[in-house]
Amino acid sequence: MRAFLKILMVLIFMSVAYAKNPSTLSKEEEVLQHLQSFSAHFKQVLKNEKPLVYYGVLKAKAPNWALWVYEKPLKKEIYMNDKEVVIYEPNLFQATITPLKDKTDFFTILKRLKKQDDGSFKTTINKTTYRLVFKDGKPFSLEFKDGMNNLVTITFSQAEINPTIANEIFVFKPKDENIDIVRQ
């Protein structure tokens, strides 16, 4: 009986060790686990009565930096770090600086994702559910409902995993000294 219990304990230990073995992770889970930086072009669709479509470039770097540069239909830059969000709207000559109350930066979302049976990844942060879909081993689309219950779908193209990105690009530096800076 003792020998049986010892063998059983060894088998249980091995099964737990195997379950924790990183080699059992899917390719997508490996990408998320080792993601330190991300760069991609994006198409953002806000689905409401009249869908709005935006195009731009995202650059993000761990632990929590992100730069969203909207190019069409209006130019806008969004700088995020662990403390604040800066929204720069060059057409309005204005930058709005808001303290970041909730950890909803790009990397916090990615780190909390859990694989679903359909192969997508989901997480819920502050009553917002995020769903990420991979294509060809890279993040392809991110969906969530915004504060006004509109479905937002961001589709990534030309995605790069762990590119070299300089920290300086995540710091807002006014390009024009005549802009208004609004602190909220």
UniProtKB/Swiss-Prot annotation:
Keywords: Chaperone, Periplasm, Protein transport, Signal, Transport. It comes from the Bacteria. Residues 1-19 form the signal peptide. GO terms for biological process: lipoprotein transport. The keyword Disulfide bond does not apply. Its main location: periplasm. The keyword Transport applies. Pfam families: LolA. It is found in: Periplasm. One of its GO terms (cellular component) is periplasmic space. InterPro entries: LolA/LolB/LppX, OM_lipoprot_carrier_LolA-like, OM_lipoprot_carrier_LolA_Pbac. Belongs to the LolA family. Participates in the translocation of lipoproteins from the inner membrane to the outer membrane. Only forms a complex with a lipoprotein if the residue after the N-terminal Cys is not an aspartate (The Asp acts as a targeting signal to indicate that the lipoprotein should stay in the inner membrane). Monomer. This is Outer-membrane lipoprotein carrier protein. It comes from Helicobacter pylori (strain ATCC 700392 / 26695) (Campylobacter pylori).
